[in-house]
Amino acid sequence: MVNIPPAEELAGRVAVVIDVLRATTTICTALANGADTVVPILSPEEAFQVARDNPDRQFLLGGERKAVLIPGFHCDNSPLEYTEARVKGRPILFTTTNGTRAIRRAAGADRVYIASLLNAPAVGRELARLEVDVAICCAGTHDQFSLEDTVCAGAILEYMAGPDRPVETNDMGLVARELFRRYDGRLADLLHLSSHGQNLVRLGMQDDLLFCAQLGTLTILPVFTEGQVVLLE
């Protein structure tokens, strides 16, 4: 059974957290480019404190507020900034408006996967292999519905299913899957329609939007465990 539930309904289930624009896309990109770990942090103040308390870790500070760089941080929330040259071997303290809070809220699940359009096919196939009860947690924008996260949920559902493997889901899951089928092959068009996508374009972040709209460019499986996001071995 796959639901898109309230965050509190996660005990005994496998959760998938999605924030396409841009937190989970950026986390996936950083890990694919060799980052050691990504630690979701709730506030800039907490990030600064953790970095001060652990100077030997040489944390990279990444994140945003209102879609722009936090003063004193090394990187904002653009996946394009998390290059191999910048992140390889580095632990990252990461705080964003929506995504990192959603990841932390999902901690009560038995396992928490981090998904974006980049790795949605890989996550969907992994969930199909596991045959578990899944909760898809869309971060949205300020806890409100978002097109980009919903279409990513639909992509995961589509890749979970097969000719002999129907996926049982709730109504929101059905809507998500139909949205993906409608926009498969032109996901950038949908992200341009979304309110968050339009905001990024207004801020001059068109390249971020196009990057985040790519489907299936990564095969990694990031998981949130013991307070940090790492790649599943």
UniProtKB/Swiss-Prot annotation:
Pfam families on file: 2-ph_phosp
GO molecular function: 2-phosphosulfolactate phosphatase activity; magnesium ion binding; sulfopyruvate decarboxylase activity
Keyword Secreted: no
Cofactor(s) needed for function: Mg(2+)
SUPFAM superfamilies: ComB-like
Source species, domain of life: Bacteria
Protein's UniProt keywords contain Ribosomal protein: no
Keywords: Hydrolase, Magnesium
Cited InterPro entries: ComB-like (IPR005238), ComB-like_sf (IPR036702)
EC number: 3.1.3.71
Enzyme class of the recorded protein, top EC level: hydrolase
Family that this chain belongs to: Belongs to the ComB family.
Annotated protein name in UniProt: Probable 2-phosphosulfolactate phosphatase
Gene coding for it: comB
